[in-house]
Each structure stands twice: as C-alpha cells, then as structure tokens.
C-alpha cells in the first residue's frame, strides 16, 4: 500500500479501492456531496476515487464522512474509507496510535492495525455493527451477458 501526501492538502492511498483523504476542522460544514463529486471525477484520478473528509477528535478518535464512487453519494459508513482515514491519521498526526475509534454517519467503527516497520501496515482489523439498511430485488431477465 502506498500512502502519498500530495502536498496540496490531501493524501491518496488504495485500501482495495482508491481513497482521497482530506483533514478538516469542521466536518459538518463540508459539502460532502458537492465537493466529493468534484474530487471523485477530477482528472487526477483517472479511474475515479472515493473521497473521505476527516476530523481529528482526539487521540485515537476521528470522525469521517465519505463520498463513495459507485454509490455516487455520501454513505452511512465505508470500511475501506475508514481504514484509509485511520492510516493517514496515524501517519500524519498520531504515529503512536494503532487503534482508532471512528465516528461515521451510521454509528461507530473501530480500526486497529500493526506497524512492524514505519509505513508498513499489517493485520488491519475493522470492527463495527452491521445493519440492514435496504432491501430490494433484481429482475435478471433484463441482464445481458
């Protein structure tokens, strides 16, 4: 995993899917849908990217709001986005912390990881409640092969 400080206010990494991470002091003031959509389709990210806005609440505690590509909207929680936010917070602001409490719109998540060498992350663990938020059906007669 390559975590890059882009030097112009954001970090970029891939936690299975690409994530843009930007810190903010006022998470509620961020236009997650408007800004998220612009960043998601920015030419710097040829295949698009998920967009995470992060507020550091305290030691080992962050809050995250995520605009998810594919969903094309803000989501209640994003596991790979919360992982990206925790790793970037560790690298940029809290190098001694390897377990984070993460507040998301849908509740609370936990991310923990090992760092056997600086910048090398292993045993990344995500915890949190899983809830059914939608039910639907697909008519496969309209699918094309």
PLM region spans:
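Active-site proximal loop and beta-alpha junction motif in alpha/beta enzyme cores
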Residues: 4-77, 84-145
